[in-house]
Swiss-Prot record:
HAMAP family: Ribosomal_uL6_B. The keyword Ribosomal protein applies. Transmembrane segments: none annotated. Part of the 50S ribosomal subunit. Keywords: Ribonucleoprotein, Ribosomal protein, RNA-binding, rRNA-binding. It comes from Methylocella silvestris (strain DSM 15510 / CIP 108128 / LMG 27833 / NCIMB 13906 / BL2). One of its GO terms (molecular function) is structural constituent of ribosome. Belongs to the universal ribosomal protein uL6 family. This protein binds to the 23S rRNA, and is important in its secondary structure. It is located near the subunit interface in the base of the L7/L12 stalk, and near the tRNA binding site of the peptidyltransferase center. This is Large ribosomal subunit protein uL6. GO terms for cellular component: cytosolic large ribosomal subunit. The keyword Ribonucleoprotein applies. GO terms for biological process: cytoplasmic translation. NCBIfam families: L6_bact.
Amino acid sequence: MSRIGKKPVAIPSGVTANVDGQLISVKGGKGQLSFAAPEDVTVVLGDGGIEVSPRNETKRARAMWGMTRSMVNNLVVGVSKGFERKLEITGVGYKAAVSGKNLQLSLGFSHDVTFPIPDGISIVAAKPTEVAISGIDKRQVGQIASEIRALRPPEPYKGKGVKYAGEFIFRKEGKKK
């Protein structure tokens, strides 16, 4: 039994949901999202919210049950509140600035890195060393944050690079004489 899958997804006020077969579409104050549920689960829109249940007792159906419920919950939270991921930039001369639809990053390379900001994503650089990525699609926000972090991941000796806010970087000791 999926403990996550058993709970129905509550729909807050200001959010409308529609279930058409396996396609779930959710509309709210921040926008509209849709998700195609796998064939292993059934999705029903009821009074208590959106309920997900497995079609049969196979291992795959049970796995898809909890995953589908989480995906539907992410749709509802995304269109009502949105998602945000913060990055911290550490290092001498390392900085970020938003110019138009691009994020300009100085990360210690011989050239500045230009990262295009996709549609549906908002990037704010309040300080040169802090970047906030926000949007309604949790997967896309996490993917963009991961791509920016991958440009210069934190190194273990001095901790220079791009890291998630609150991320612990395992530090190593330098060479001994």
